[in-house]
């Protein structure tokens, strides 16, 4: 809803919607990576979870956040988690529609944030271990 309100506000004050769209464009590689993450997500207890096979991919933090947002559009998904490799460890990008407090889940992994948007970083682990720890934090 906030995106729609922001777009309506920008239009009201005379912003060029084509120029705004250009600001939010991404490379084909980043778009394909986001689509792959969404396509390979699994749902566990109302939470969509995707683990990126790419480590230190270009713009992975932005791509993961966008994919996490996109997963919330799936019926029955109350929260989403993207797990991705960055700087020799694993990072988490978490989003929620409000029913699940992702801040609390990310705090269990040493991270933090807000009720509907949070994250964490863990050094020295791989994607499988990160997934396992995330499942335990959700439980």
Predicted regions and their residues:
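Hydrophobic helix-and-loop "lid/oligomerization" segment in the mid-to-C-terminal part
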Residues: 1-139
């Amino acid at each position: 809803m906030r995106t729609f309100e922001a777009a309506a506000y920008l239009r009201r004050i005379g912003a060029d919607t084509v120029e705004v769209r250009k600001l939010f464009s991404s490379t084909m590689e980043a778009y394909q990576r986001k689509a792959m993450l969404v396509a390979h997500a699994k749902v566990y207890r109302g939470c969509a979870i995707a683990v990126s096979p790419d480590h230190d991919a270009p713009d992975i933090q932005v791509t993961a956040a966008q994919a996490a947002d996109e997963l919330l559009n799936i019926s029955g998904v109350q929260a989403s988690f993207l797990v991705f490799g960055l700087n020799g460890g694993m990072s988490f990008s978490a989003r929620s529609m409000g029913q699940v407090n992702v801040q609390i889940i990310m705090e269990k992994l040493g991270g933090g944030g807000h009720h509907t948007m949070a994250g964490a970083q863990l050094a020295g682990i791989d994607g499988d271990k990160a997934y396992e720890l995330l499942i335990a934090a959700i439980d």
